[in-house]
Each structure stands twice: as C-alpha cells, then as structure tokens.
Amino acid sequence: MLKSNYTPDLVQRVILFLLLFVSVSCETLDPYYKTQENLDLSIQAFNFEFESKAMNISARFVHPAHRANYKAQSLEMTQRITFFEATILDIKFFKIGVPVVTTSKGPEKGFNRAIVTIRYQLAILPSTKLVTRLVEQEWVLEGEQWMVIPDLSTLLE
C-alpha cells in the first residue's frame, strides 16, 4: 500500500488556510467593504490634491452642485494659503441623515454620508503666522462615487 507524504497535520493546516483565504476574499467582494474602501481612497486622494493646490484635479471629487463655487474660490486658496500639516481627527457616518453605529469592524452597512473632521496647520497671507483650523468635510455617496461638499470659507477666515 502506498503511504502519503502528507501528514494529517499539514493537510489540516492547508484546509484551514484555504478556508481563511476564501473567507477574506468574500469580504473584499462585499459591496459594503467596497463602499468603505472607496470613501477612504476618495478622502485621501482629494485631500492630497487639495493640499498640493491642484484645485482643477481635486475638483473631480467635488459634488457637481458645488463645483463652480469651489473653482471660483480656488484662485484665492492657491494664492493665500500654505498648508503645513493635516490630520484627520474623526469620521462620523450617517444613513439617510441618522448617525450609524460604528464598531471595531467599522460603520454599519448602508451609510451614504460621512463628516470628516480635519485639523490643518497653515499660514494665510498676508500673515506668516502658523494657525490651526478645524474643518468638517461633508462626503455624500452619489451612485457609486463619493463626492465632497467643501466649505472653503473656514480656511480663508
């Protein structure tokens, strides 16, 4: 009789690995996790472009109803503000206007709005003094794309 080179312990480990792999793979295909990931990526990309003063590029993340106003204020932003540091302090999630429960796994499913609180260290010309501003960015889910509704006035005060 032929004897297998694989020990029962090794076979159990391989099966356990495959089960874990399939479990994790299924989670990444879940639209809920995709929504969360898309929000995170949109926040990072917009703020990187915004802080780099690439206003025309960052405008792709601005809600269409607010894009014209954003572009109108962009010249003043690029001329007067120098960013030194930005830190995301908090993200609150909402589903149809109602706050959702957030656990260690993240917010509950179905959220379609988020409020991101960011602390900026910046200088606003003509002053060269470093100031701190707390800004709330409102993000809304439009179809499958997250869009920001920016309020630049808090930065220009």
Where do the language-model regions lie?
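N-terminal secretory signal peptides that target proteins for export/translocation
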Residues: 1-10
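Bacterial N-terminal signal peptides
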Residues: 13-23
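Glycine-centered loop/turn positions within well-structured domains
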Residues: 24, 56, 146
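Short, low-complexity N-terminal intrinsically disordered segments enriched in polar/charged residues
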Residues: 25-52
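Short solvent-exposed beta->alpha transition segments
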Residues: 40, 55-103, 111
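Structured segments of extracytoplasmic/periplasmic soluble domains
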Residues: 45-53, 61-65, 80, 142-145
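Exposed beta-sheet edge and beta->alpha loop/turn motif
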Residues: 98-157
